[in-house]
């Protein structure tokens, strides 16, 4: 809550468009606080250009840091320069394997990356549904064992959160991931389908689209995507990439 208030204050005084990224309530001590933060953001939007983005998972991913480990329920190591073969393993299991404390295990692995399980579904759903929220992947392509959001974010929103859970209609789900983002970041002629716009298109089946990537197998292809166009050129079809680089 303090950080959101600080951001709103800076945005108001600087009079610049501001994006709160990636809005979440991490750590059990913060669960439920999205009720307050979203009210603060909604009120601030009346007088400021204030937006927020989020991703559709209750686990985050960044460098392996002791401060982050302390507030997470579970930690998976995504990569380690010193131990490249341990990608995807549980930090607690590695601690037992090495016969070291968690802190010393982190020192042994560092530099390294990790996935932190530290958010609550109710907060996530509330933030996803917030009218002003954009949805992105925040994926990190270079990780040896990436967060599944890298491969599954957008089909997950369309399949799980829109079709199955009905948090918002299909057209709103699409807008949160395309038109809204293009508008906020000033990407002219992108994000919407219109005459004269760049033809960035995804052809998908709304009845079957769903993510398959998991924390155990994070690179599984999603289902229900028939083809993808970038600048009018087909870059994905028949469940595989083409050679086009538009």
List each model region and its residues:
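Acidic, glycine-enriched loop/beta-strand segments at the rims
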Residues: 114-125, 168-174, 182-219
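Structured C-terminal cores of nucleic-acid metabolism proteins
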Residues: 161, 173-176
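C-terminal cap of metal-dependent C-N hydrolases
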Residues: 126-132, 137-138, 153, 201-245
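Divalent metal-coordination and catalytic microenvironments
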Residues: 53, 99, 138, 173, ...
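Active-site neighborhoods of metal-dependent hydrolases
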Residues: 4, 8-12, 16-166
